[in-house]
Amino acid sequence: MKRRPRKWKKKGRMRWKWIKKRIRRLKRQRKKERGLI
């Protein structure tokens, strides 16, 4: 495991949160599509 500078940790957390939000949005869109069909 390579050691990362402390600055990277915060960026990684923000990215992870953003990814989770996107996944939630995609799931919501799929539910809406199923309801329309």
UniProtKB/Swiss-Prot annotation:
The keyword Ribonucleoprotein applies. GO terms for cellular component: ribonucleoprotein complex; ribosome. Keywords: Ribonucleoprotein, Ribosomal protein. Part of the small ribosomal subunit. Initially thought to be part of the large ribosomal subunit. Crystal structures show eS32/eL41 to be a small ribosomal subunit forming a bridge at the interface of the 2 subunits. Belongs to the eukaryotic ribosomal protein eS32 family. This is Small ribosomal subunit protein eS32.
